[in-house]
Amino acid sequence: MWASCCNWFCLDGQPEETPPPQGARTQAYSNPGYSSFPSPTGSEPSCKACGVHFASTTRKQTCLDCKKNFCMTCSSQEGNGPRLCLLCLRFRATAFQREELMKMKVKDLRDYLSLHDISTEMCREKEELVFLVLGQQPVISEADRTRAPTLPQAFPEQQAFLTQPQSSTVPPTSPGLPSSPAQVTSVLAQDQETQQAIGHVSQDHEEPIFLESTARVPPEDETQSVDSEDSFVPGRRASLSDLTHLEDIEGLTVRQLKEILARNFVNYKGCCEKWELMERVTRLYKDQKGLQHLVSGNEDQNGGAVPSGLEENLCKICMDSPIDCVLLECGHMVTCTKCGKRMNECPICRQYVIRAVHVFRS
């Protein structure tokens, strides 16, 4: 286009528009993601268990526990209680006790947790699923809260106190209690006279009098059971020092067996059954006890001093435990398992320690 000033040689900076060719039709802008088909309708509400679509909202029932929708067949209501789905009803029947939850199938535990939108991807053991279920307990109803626990016959007074309705916070005054200062002084004088009389009787007959106390001393069986239960704390990892006898290995779970082997750098890959893990833990326990008896026996024979021949087999870090660990990649055997897992570099060649492996002595 020529400029309008002189209509000659002066060009403006605008590009020249090319006219469209003849016969070409102008096409409107079209979105490639647009579809001429109608948009799909939202998913119809259906039962979470059987997948049946609800024809009407009257057939849709909401579980009070997991807040999911179920049909009349997959939900139940006992008396005037809340309506629950069949799976939540089964879990409520266990009263969320750990022993009862361990008897349930793994599939039911995972289904219950998925209903409550709890991920189970990192759970490898059944105990982990039970732990998550225990942390997802529903709210206890008022009837369960006011229900008094059953106490043994040794506490009849406490049982009667729990069963009495608490109408007011202020207890009623009993007729046997003194209400005036004069009666209080008379009661104290009577108590002193009775104590003196009891003292004279005990001196005459030389028989000690034992007063009954409200605190009950637990028998020896109960104290032993408590000590045995405290030996394995749920929040703490299992260790080889927790075992006192070979019979204790049979009571360990698969997770505890793997923890013991991992802490002592024993490879358990390829073990598909529990008895294979138990064999490796048993061998580790016997090997550890044998080395400890060997060191302690030689020290006792030499009067507390370790002989020069045995000193070569002791850990060069702590000089207390025998050498039962090899450092990789250098391959030096200079430490015990306890010191080997703390080494960043080999104390001999200063090479970086990738990992430590437990070695069984033949």
UniProtKB/Swiss-Prot annotation:
Keywords: Apoptosis, Cell membrane, Cytoplasm, Endosome, Lipoprotein, Membrane, Metal-binding, Palmitate, Phosphoprotein, Repeat, Transferase, Ubl conjugation, Ubl conjugation pathway, Zinc, Zinc-finger. Its main location: cytoplasm. The modification Phosphoserine is found at residues 225, 228, 231, 239. Transmembrane segments: none annotated. A zinc finger (RING-type) spans 315-350. One of its GO terms (molecular function) is p53 binding. One of its GO terms (biological process) is ubiquitin-dependent protein catabolic process. Ubiquitous. Detected in cerebrum, cerebellum, midbrain, brain stem, hippocampus, striatum, liver, heart, lung, kidney, muscle, spleen and testis. Residues 101-120, 249-263 form the SAP domain. It is found in: Cytoplasm, Cytosol; Cell membrane; Recycling endosome membrane. It catalyses: S-ubiquitinyl-[E2 ubiquitin-conjugating enzyme]-L-cysteine + [acceptor protein]-L-lysine = [E2 ubiquitin-conjugating enzyme]-L-cysteine + N(6)-ubiquitinyl-[acceptor protein]-L-lysine. The RING-type zinc finger is required for the ubiquitination of target proteins. The FYVE-type zinc finger domain is required for localization to the recycling endosome membranes and the function in endocytic recycling. Interacts with CASP8 and CASP10. Interacts with RIPK1 (via protein kinase domain); involved in RIPK1 ubiquitination. Interacts with PRR5L. Interacts (via RING-type zinc finger) with p53/TP53; involved in p53/TP53 ubiquitination. Interacts (via RING-type zinc finger) with MDM2; the interaction stabilizes MDM2. This is E3 ubiquitin-protein ligase rififylin. The lineage of its organism: Eukaryota, Metazoa, Chordata, Craniata, Vertebrata. The gene is Rffl.
